Amino acid sequence: SFHFGNLMALERDEGNGFGPILSSIAFPAAGIRAVGWQGGAVLHRNALGITSENPMKVRECNRVEDATLLVTSHWTTSEQVGDSRMQTLIDRAKLYRTWGDCFGYFAVASGGADIMIDPDLSYWDVAALIPVVEGAGGVITSTSGGNPLKEKSAVCTAGGALHEEVLRALNA
């Protein structure tokens, strides 16, 4: 599948424990790779021997009603986050798709979606997502609003008011 991805993160101890400082989300079959770091993210494309490199940026979206919402699995998300709360978000979103895993985070970071929710992640899954998402201007926390590396869940959004709105809905 074109959206099978490879994740890689480089960590460094900045004085408060190890955390990711540089990462990559790559989709080899599609010839695309996102690289993120504190303060930036870039999209590399290699198609038919032609290589291009462009800055990545989340798109402007401030309301769930205007958002494209992605999850890895509807069943897993509903079971673990709480069916009625998740269903309310689904009903409010402009568009809802169960097309997640690392492609969902890539979609938010590259401006193709606005919200990605994953209630069950491993450390090695989320570590590579953080620099790419944040470097593109997005926000990524756990579903409770905490550190996704420690709580092993993630809410990724285009940022600001949208992120707060999603967290309020999930934790109501």
Across the structure, where does each feature detected by a protein language model lie?
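Short, surface-exposed loop motifs enriched in S/T, G, D/E and P with embedded aromatic residues
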Residues: 49-58
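An extended, acidic
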Residues: 57-172
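DPxDG-like acidic metal-binding loop motif
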Residues: 1-43, 47
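Hydrophobic/proline-rich hinge and linker segments of small-molecule sensing/allosteric domains
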Residues: 42-45, 49-50, 65, 69-71
